[in-house]
Amino acid sequence: MTICYFSAQYLPTVGGVERYTWNLARCTVAAGHRAIVVTSALPNLPEHEIDGDGIEIYRLPVWPVMNGRFPVIKPGARFHALTAQIWVQKLDFCVVQTRMYTQSVWAARAAKRRGIPMLVIDHSTGYMPMGNGLLGACGRLYEQVACRMVRSTGAPFYGVSAAACRWLHTFGITAAGTMPNAIDPAALEQEAAHAPDWRAKLNLGDRKIVLFVGRLIPEKGAGLLAQAVAQLPGVVLVAAGSGPQQQELADRVIRFHV
Protein backbone atom coordinates (compact mmCIF):
# COMPACT_ATOMS: atom_id res chain seq x y z
CA MET A 1 0.00 0.00 0.00
CA THR A 2 1.28 3.48 -0.88
CA ILE A 3 0.24 6.38 1.36
CA CYS A 4 1.08 9.95 0.39
CA TYR A 5 1.35 12.62 3.08
CA PHE A 6 0.98 16.22 1.90
CA SER A 7 2.59 18.52 4.44
CA ALA A 8 3.61 22.05 3.41
CA GLN A 9 6.00 22.08 6.39
CA TYR A 10 8.30 19.13 7.04
CA LEU A 11 11.65 18.24 8.56
CA PRO A 12 14.27 19.60 8.98
CA THR A 13 11.98 22.55 9.80
CA VAL A 14 11.18 22.24 13.51
CA GLY A 15 7.53 22.01 14.55
CA GLY A 16 4.64 19.84 15.59
CA VAL A 17 3.17 19.27 12.13
CA GLU A 18 6.61 18.35 10.82
CA ARG A 19 7.25 15.67 13.45
CA TYR A 20 3.65 14.47 13.29
CA THR A 21 4.01 13.83 9.56
CA TRP A 22 7.41 12.23 10.00
CA ASN A 23 6.12 9.83 12.66
CA LEU A 24 3.16 8.82 10.51
CA ALA A 25 5.42 8.24 7.50
CA ARG A 26 8.08 6.24 9.32
CA CYS A 27 5.47 4.06 11.01
CA THR A 28 3.93 3.45 7.59
CA VAL A 29 7.30 2.20 6.35
CA ALA A 30 7.84 0.13 9.51
CA ALA A 31 4.48 -1.57 8.88
CA GLY A 32 5.71 -2.72 5.48
CA HIS A 33 4.01 -0.09 3.35
CA ARG A 34 5.36 2.72 1.21
CA ALA A 35 5.31 6.32 2.45
CA ILE A 36 5.65 9.42 0.29
CA VAL A 37 5.89 12.91 1.78
CA VAL A 38 5.16 15.90 -0.46
CA THR A 39 6.38 19.14 1.05
CA SER A 40 7.94 22.51 0.22
CA ALA A 41 11.39 23.11 -1.20
CA LEU A 42 14.11 24.26 1.20
CA PRO A 43 17.57 25.65 0.39
CA ASN A 44 20.29 23.04 -0.18
CA LEU A 45 17.89 20.08 -0.06
CA PRO A 46 17.16 17.83 -3.06
CA GLU A 47 13.77 18.05 -4.72
CA HIS A 48 13.46 14.26 -4.57
CA GLU A 49 15.09 11.72 -2.27
CA ILE A 50 14.54 8.63 -0.14
CA ASP A 51 15.75 9.36 3.39
CA GLY A 52 17.32 7.09 5.99
CA ASP A 53 13.90 6.02 7.27
CA GLY A 54 12.89 4.78 3.83
CA ILE A 55 10.50 7.71 3.28
CA GLU A 56 10.32 9.07 -0.26
CA ILE A 57 10.25 12.88 -0.22
CA TYR A 58 9.25 15.34 -2.92
CA ARG A 59 9.94 19.04 -2.34
CA LEU A 60 7.84 21.29 -4.53
CA PRO A 61 8.96 24.79 -5.57
CA VAL A 62 7.36 27.51 -3.45
CA TRP A 63 7.49 31.18 -2.61
CA PRO A 64 8.53 31.33 1.11
CA VAL A 65 5.90 33.86 2.20
CA MET A 66 6.07 35.15 5.81
CA ASN A 67 9.71 34.04 6.15
CA GLY A 68 8.76 30.53 5.11
CA ARG A 69 5.92 30.16 7.61
CA PHE A 70 3.41 30.16 4.76
CA PRO A 71 4.95 28.55 1.67
CA VAL A 72 2.93 29.23 -1.48
CA ILE A 73 3.04 26.84 -4.43
CA LYS A 74 5.12 28.18 -7.32
CA PRO A 75 3.68 26.86 -10.59
CA GLY A 76 6.05 26.18 -13.44
CA ALA A 77 7.91 23.48 -15.32
CA ARG A 78 9.57 21.96 -12.22
CA PHE A 79 6.32 21.93 -10.27
CA HIS A 80 4.49 20.12 -13.06
CA ALA A 81 7.35 17.68 -13.62
CA LEU A 82 7.55 16.74 -9.94
CA THR A 83 3.80 16.43 -9.45
CA ALA A 84 3.57 14.25 -12.55
CA GLN A 85 6.07 11.89 -10.90
CA ILE A 86 3.92 11.80 -7.77
CA TRP A 87 0.57 11.07 -9.41
CA VAL A 88 1.95 8.39 -11.73
CA GLN A 89 2.74 6.22 -8.70
CA LYS A 90 -0.83 4.98 -8.18
CA LEU A 91 -1.37 6.24 -4.65
CA ASP A 92 -3.73 4.20 -2.48
CA PHE A 93 -4.47 6.89 0.11
CA CYS A 94 -3.65 10.55 0.77
CA VAL A 95 -3.33 12.44 4.05
CA VAL A 96 -3.51 16.24 3.83
CA GLN A 97 -1.94 18.03 6.78
CA THR A 98 -3.76 21.23 7.77
CA ARG A 99 -6.49 22.91 5.77
CA MET A 100 -5.17 26.34 4.82
CA TYR A 101 -1.93 26.02 2.87
CA THR A 102 -2.06 26.41 -0.90
CA GLN A 103 -0.50 22.95 -1.13
CA SER A 104 -3.35 21.55 0.97
CA VAL A 105 -5.97 23.01 -1.36
CA TRP A 106 -4.14 21.79 -4.45
CA ALA A 107 -3.53 18.30 -3.02
CA ALA A 108 -7.11 17.76 -1.85
CA ARG A 109 -8.59 18.85 -5.18
CA ALA A 110 -6.06 16.86 -7.21
CA ALA A 111 -6.67 13.68 -5.18
CA LYS A 112 -10.43 14.16 -5.55
CA ARG A 113 -10.12 14.42 -9.35
CA ARG A 114 -8.17 11.17 -9.41
CA GLY A 115 -10.57 9.32 -7.16
CA ILE A 116 -7.96 8.73 -4.45
CA PRO A 117 -9.43 8.35 -0.94
CA MET A 118 -8.08 10.84 1.59
CA LEU A 119 -8.53 12.62 4.89
CA VAL A 120 -7.52 16.01 6.25
CA ILE A 121 -5.85 16.48 9.64
CA ASP A 122 -6.03 19.97 11.12
CA HIS A 123 -3.64 21.22 13.78
CA SER A 124 -4.83 24.76 14.43
CA THR A 125 -7.09 26.36 17.01
CA GLY A 126 -7.32 29.81 15.46
CA TYR A 127 -6.56 31.93 12.44
CA MET A 128 -2.95 32.59 11.51
CA PRO A 129 -2.05 35.75 13.46
CA MET A 130 -1.61 38.58 10.98
CA GLY A 131 -2.93 41.49 13.04
CA ASN A 132 -6.32 43.16 13.17
CA GLY A 133 -5.88 45.47 10.18
CA LEU A 134 -6.49 44.93 6.48
CA LEU A 135 -3.80 42.25 6.24
CA GLY A 136 -5.41 40.27 9.05
CA ALA A 137 -8.85 40.56 7.45
CA CYS A 138 -7.46 39.36 4.12
CA GLY A 139 -5.75 36.45 5.85
CA ARG A 140 -8.94 35.35 7.56
CA LEU A 141 -10.88 35.64 4.30
CA TYR A 142 -8.27 33.53 2.54
CA GLU A 143 -8.50 30.82 5.23
CA GLN A 144 -12.28 30.70 4.87
CA VAL A 145 -12.08 30.36 1.09
CA ALA A 146 -9.28 27.77 1.25
CA CYS A 147 -11.15 25.73 3.83
CA ARG A 148 -14.32 25.86 1.74
CA MET A 149 -12.41 24.53 -1.26
CA VAL A 150 -10.92 21.65 0.72
CA ARG A 151 -14.28 20.89 2.35
CA SER A 152 -15.92 20.72 -1.09
CA THR A 153 -13.89 17.59 -1.88
CA GLY A 154 -15.92 15.66 0.68
CA ALA A 155 -12.82 14.49 2.55
CA PRO A 156 -13.35 13.80 6.26
CA PHE A 157 -11.62 16.21 8.66
CA TYR A 158 -9.86 15.21 11.87
CA GLY A 159 -8.33 17.40 14.57
CA VAL A 160 -5.22 16.68 16.62
CA SER A 161 -7.08 17.78 19.75
CA ALA A 162 -10.57 18.52 21.01
CA ALA A 163 -9.76 22.23 20.64
CA ALA A 164 -8.79 21.73 16.99
CA CYS A 165 -12.06 19.88 16.39
CA ARG A 166 -14.01 22.73 17.97
CA TRP A 167 -12.18 25.27 15.83
CA LEU A 168 -13.29 23.44 12.68
CA HIS A 169 -16.88 24.41 13.56
CA THR A 170 -15.85 27.96 12.57
CA PHE A 171 -15.82 26.72 8.98
CA GLY A 172 -18.99 24.68 9.23
CA ILE A 173 -17.08 21.42 9.63
CA THR A 174 -17.85 18.67 12.12
CA ALA A 175 -14.70 16.65 12.71
CA ALA A 176 -14.94 12.93 12.09
CA GLY A 177 -12.71 12.33 15.09
CA THR A 178 -9.48 13.16 16.87
CA MET A 179 -6.01 12.00 15.82
CA PRO A 180 -3.82 13.29 18.64
CA ASN A 181 -0.11 13.82 18.63
CA ALA A 182 1.57 10.76 20.10
CA ILE A 183 4.76 10.01 22.01
CA ASP A 184 6.95 7.02 21.19
CA PRO A 185 7.62 5.58 24.70
CA ALA A 186 10.66 3.59 23.58
CA ALA A 187 12.30 6.60 21.91
CA LEU A 188 11.49 8.83 24.89
CA GLU A 189 12.97 6.33 27.35
CA GLN A 190 16.14 6.03 25.27
CA GLU A 191 16.60 9.79 25.09
CA ALA A 192 15.85 10.26 28.79
CA ALA A 193 18.49 7.71 29.74
CA HIS A 194 21.20 9.89 28.21
CA ALA A 195 19.74 13.30 28.96
CA PRO A 196 22.20 15.87 30.36
CA ASP A 197 21.58 17.72 33.60
CA TRP A 198 20.26 20.89 32.01
CA ARG A 199 19.98 22.72 35.32
CA ALA A 200 23.71 22.27 35.89
CA LYS A 201 24.62 22.69 32.21
CA LEU A 202 22.86 26.06 32.04
CA ASN A 203 24.03 27.07 35.53
CA LEU A 204 20.50 27.75 36.74
CA GLY A 205 21.00 26.78 40.37
CA ASP A 206 17.79 26.27 42.31
CA ARG A 207 15.67 28.71 40.33
CA LYS A 208 12.33 27.51 39.07
CA ILE A 209 12.32 26.69 35.34
CA VAL A 210 9.60 27.31 32.79
CA LEU A 211 10.36 25.33 29.63
CA PHE A 212 9.13 26.19 26.14
CA VAL A 213 9.69 23.71 23.30
CA GLY A 214 8.47 24.59 19.83
CA ARG A 215 8.80 26.88 16.85
CA LEU A 216 9.60 30.46 17.78
CA ILE A 217 6.78 32.14 15.91
CA PRO A 218 4.17 34.58 17.25
CA GLU A 219 1.26 32.14 17.14
CA LYS A 220 3.04 29.73 19.50
CA GLY A 221 3.13 32.37 22.23
CA ALA A 222 6.80 32.17 23.26
CA GLY A 223 7.13 35.96 23.26
CA LEU A 224 4.13 36.42 25.54
CA LEU A 225 5.43 33.67 27.81
CA ALA A 226 8.80 35.43 28.06
CA GLN A 227 7.07 38.67 29.10
CA ALA A 228 5.11 36.85 31.79
CA VAL A 229 8.10 34.94 33.17
CA ALA A 230 10.14 38.16 33.35
CA GLN A 231 7.71 39.39 36.03
CA LEU A 232 8.22 36.35 38.26
CA PRO A 233 11.15 36.56 40.71
CA GLY A 234 13.31 33.46 40.92
CA VAL A 235 11.90 32.01 37.69
CA VAL A 236 13.79 31.52 34.42
CA LEU A 237 12.47 30.69 30.97
CA VAL A 238 14.39 28.13 28.93
CA ALA A 239 13.36 27.93 25.27
CA ALA A 240 14.29 25.18 22.82
CA GLY A 241 13.49 25.88 19.20
CA SER A 242 14.16 28.13 16.26
CA GLY A 243 12.26 30.64 14.18
CA PRO A 244 11.75 34.33 13.39
CA GLN A 245 11.44 35.28 17.10
CA GLN A 246 14.78 33.73 18.01
CA GLN A 247 16.71 36.99 18.40
CA GLU A 248 13.83 38.68 20.22
CA LEU A 249 13.74 35.89 22.79
CA ALA A 250 17.52 35.65 23.02
CA ASP A 251 17.50 39.23 24.29
CA ARG A 252 15.09 38.28 27.09
CA VAL A 253 15.82 34.71 28.03
CA ILE A 254 18.63 33.99 30.47
CA ARG A 255 19.60 30.84 28.62
CA PHE A 256 18.59 30.09 25.05
CA HIS A 257 19.17 26.66 23.53
CA VAL A 258 18.56 25.93 19.83
Model-flagged regions — what are they?
Residues 19, 208-231, 244-247:
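A conserved mid-protein helix/loop that constitutes part of the nucleotide-sugar donor-binding site
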Residues 52, 61-94, 98, 102-109, ...:
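An amphipathic, basic-hydrophobic alpha-helix
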Residues 41, 163, 182:
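Carbohydrate-associated surface elements
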Residues 6-8, 160, 182, 212-214, ...:
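Short hydrophobic "strand-cap" motifs at the C-terminus of beta-strands
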Residues 189-204, 209:
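A short helix/loop element that forms part of the nucleotide-sugar donor recognition site in Leloir-type
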Residues 117-119, 126-149, 153, 158-159, ...:
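Nucleotide-sugar donor phosphate/pyrophosphate-binding loop at the beta->alpha transition
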